[in-house]
């Protein structure tokens, strides 16, 4: 509900669908929101920074609900993937790092069908603050909306 309200407020204020910039589990929250609201047409693009799209090795030590959801091959992640329509990943640009100390191995931070951007030598939290990623995210504001299947637009 919070994501839906925020997207609605930005759209009302600007007249445009927003670019969502999501760090870590925020990218999973965006995917869950897109699933729950069938909201593909309501966003311009979704940029994920170090999101554990396929889980993360470190989550095996978590005992919280969110931590269990981020375990590699968790039932929650499998259900999320299974319930996403074909072509949704085209909305996504996924930044990932070979030095992410939270989301690893690096391959878990990519979403099949999305655009992928490798950032070398950057740890998990730096992905949000590093000038390279910030500037690249700003450039995405000008990128054309990807063509999606008519069913999801």
Language model features: what each stretch is:
Residues 87-153:
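C-terminal catalytic-base region of ester-bond hydrolases, centering on the histidine
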Residues 1-88, 95, 102:
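Serine-dependent carboxylesterase/thioesterase catalytic core
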């Amino acid at each position: 509900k919070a994501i839906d309200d925020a997207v609605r407020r930005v759209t009302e204020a600007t007249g445009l669908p927003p670019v969502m910039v999501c760090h870590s589990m925020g990218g999973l929250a965006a995917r869950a929101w897109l699933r729950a609201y069938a909201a593909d047409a309501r966003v311009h693009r979704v940029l994920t920074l170090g999101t554990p799209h396929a889980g993360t090795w470190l989550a095996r030590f978590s005992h919280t609900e969110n931590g269990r959801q981020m375990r590699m091959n968790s039932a929650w992640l499998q259900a999320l993937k299974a319930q996403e329509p074909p072509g949704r990943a085209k909305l996504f640009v996924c930044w990932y790092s070979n030095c992410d100390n939270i989301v690893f191995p690096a391959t878990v931070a990519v979403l099949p069908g999305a655009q992928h951007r490798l950032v070398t030598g950057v740890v998990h939290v730096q992905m949000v603050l590093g000038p390279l990623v910030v500037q690249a995210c700003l450039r995405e504001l000008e990128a054309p909306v990807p063509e999606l299947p008519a069913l999801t637009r």
